[in-house]
Every structure is written in structure tokens, then in C-alpha cells.
């Protein structure tokens, strides 16, 4: 029996919406990365993008466990000498709540061109409203 390999033309991609209210960051990110990658589907093929589109709403209401709110840091470097910036989780939640979820999920996806293509299917919104209603997303309870 030959191994199954999915064809790009035969793949149907669905839209899912996830509410991040009171969800733990890492647990949500790992579940979302599985749906983005398509590992929940029986026709999963590692070298083809078979995953679905994911919309995450209420990103500003995500939580972390333990002391990570004070002790977790996000780093950014401008490329110049001494140009490193260090932000706490609390600061990022106030100013850029969508970047926290995007960064967590991006680290769980493949590195390379396929990972970049998969990452573009993730849409994150800080509050309850989003502009993708025309896609008719199905709500997922994770």
C-alpha cells in the first residue's frame, strides 16, 4: 500500500475563531499551532500547507501562570551597538497584546518558507471585534 500524500488542489481550508479570554498562553499557542499546521487532519503531509485559518479574539485577556507576568521578558534589537530593548510581559500586554500570542505561536511553527506561509494564516485581534466576518469562521472551544 502506498503512502498518502496530499495534493494542494484537494485541500479544503476552513476558518476557525478562538476566544483567548482567560486562556493560558502556552497551552493556547500549542493548540493553535496544531490547527495552523494541519496536524489535526488525517491528510496531514509535512511538506504541504494543509492547515486551516485561525482568528484569535480577545488577545488582551490572555493569562500566564506563575510569576511570568513580572519575570518574562521580550527582547528586541535594533541592529546597532547597544540597541537591545527589553520589555516585560506586563508592558507588552498593555501596549502590544497581539504580539505576545503571535510570538508564542511563531516559535512553534516550522522555520523556513513553509513556516512563514503557515504563519500568515493566523489573524490576532486584541478585542472582541474582527473584520473577517465574511469568512464565516466556526468558533472553536479550546
Swiss-Prot record:
Pfam families tied to this protein: Ribosomal_L13 (PF00572)
This protein's GO CC annotations: cytosolic large ribosomal subunit
InterPro entries from the UniProt entry: Ribosomal_uL13, Ribosomal_uL13_bac-type, Ribosomal_uL13_sf
GO molecular function: mRNA binding; structural constituent of ribosome
Keywords in alphabetical order: Ribonucleoprotein, Ribosomal protein
A single BP term in Gene Ontology: negative regulation of translation
Coiled-coil segments: none
Subunit relationships: Part of the 50S ribosomal subunit.
Family: Belongs to the universal ribosomal protein uL13 family.
Function of the protein: This protein is one of the early assembly proteins of the 50S ribosomal subunit, although it is not seen to bind rRNA by itself. It is important during the early stages of 50S assembly.
HAMAP family named in the record: Ribosomal_uL13 (MF_01366)
Protein name as catalogued: Large ribosomal subunit protein uL13
Organism the protein comes from: Buchnera aphidicola subsp. Cinara cedri (strain Cc)
Amino acid at each position: 500500500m502506498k503512502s498518502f500524500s496530499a495534493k494542494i488542489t484537494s485541500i479544503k481550508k476552513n476558518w476557525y475563531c478562538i476566544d483567548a479570554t482567560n486562556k493560558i498562553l502556552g497551552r493556547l499557542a500549542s493548540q493553535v499551532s496544531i490547527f495552523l499546521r494541519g496536524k489535526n487532519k488525517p491528510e496531514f503531509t509535512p511538506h504541504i500547507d494543509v492547515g486551516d485559518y485561525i482568528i484569535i479574539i480577545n488577545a488582551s485577556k490572555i493569562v500566564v501562570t506563575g510569576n511570568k507576568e513580572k519575570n518574562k521578558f521580550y527582547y528586541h534589537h535594533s541592529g546597532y551597538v547597544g540597541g537591545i530593548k527589553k520589555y516585560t510581559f506586563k508592558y507588552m500586554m498593555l501596549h502590544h497584546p497581539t504580539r505576545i500570542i503571535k510570538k508564542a505561536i511563531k516559535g512553534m511553527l516550522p522555520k523556513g518558507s513553509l513556516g512563514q506561509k503557515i504563519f500568515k494564516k493566523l489573524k490576532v485581534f486584541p478585542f472582541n471585534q474582527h473584520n473577517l466576518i465574511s469568512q464565516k469562521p466556526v468558533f472553536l472551544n479550546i
